[in-house]
Curated annotation (Swiss-Prot):
Snake venom serine protease that activates plasminogen. Displays indirect fibrino(geno)lytic activity through conversion of plasminogen to plasmin. Shows a preferential cleavage at Arg-|-Xaa instead of Lys-|-Xaa bonds. Glycans are attached at residue 44. It comes from the Eukaryota. Disulfide bonds join 31-163, 50-66, 98-256, 142-210, 174-189, 200-225. One of its GO terms (cellular component) is extracellular region. It comes from Gloydius brevicauda. This is Venom plasminogen activator Haly-PA. Transmembrane segments: none annotated. Residues 19-24 form a propeptide. GO terms for molecular function: serine-type endopeptidase activity; toxin activity.
Amino acid sequence: MALIRVLANLLILQLSYAQKSSELVVGGDECNINEHRSLVVLFNSSGLICSGTLINQEWVLTAAHCDSKNFQMLFGVHSKKILNEDEQTRDPKEKFICPNKKKDDEKDKDIMLIRLDSPVSNSEHIAPLSLPSSSPTVDSVCRIMGWGTIKPADETYPDVPHCANINILDHTVCRAAYPVLLAGSSTLCAGTQQGGKDTCVGDSGGPLICNGQIQGIVSWGAHPCGQGSKPGVYTKVFDHLDWIKSIIAGNTAVTCPP
């Protein structure tokens, strides 16, 4: 297992690769070492793919557009240069994407549940994040975090995850910025009206955390990142609670909300 952890760290160092549609944290600072215990790194032989969120010992929540072949997940990592003794690596056992997702629309129902090949153990640097008990309100202060680029216009990747505070914005702000976004979309609009803080390349699939609960999944946004007039778009976890709980309970035929 030690060899696997070292290999995983070496792979994460290969951060020259990032999906075009991925997102990352700009305008933030290094996360506190113990504030991202639920943050998961999805990687393959090319390097970083996405982030994810541990929601219990056996399940990870991420974005559907993060789906890839032959990826692994790394838990409990803070610095790419310093190994945490409690880091753990897992393979996906099962992956679930909304069966009613539009196949030709990457932005539609951008949510994926991953069942691990074996449960992870809670530790100093690993713990699940709670699912939402209610929908977040406009102006709520929420936390974003990830391994994505820290510069809005080019790909500069940090050695540690970065975190920043942003706000839940009225959905009309994102609809004005992105005409393709439907009024009834199960998404959250989040950012800062003055700009400068945003998820960006490399942060896709990571969490939007409000009051200690995962309320959103990093999905998509503008490039360059951090534009006040073009906030980030996040999959709204609260709207998908029934689907998430049904899948975990074994009802894999359930569909997501329209």
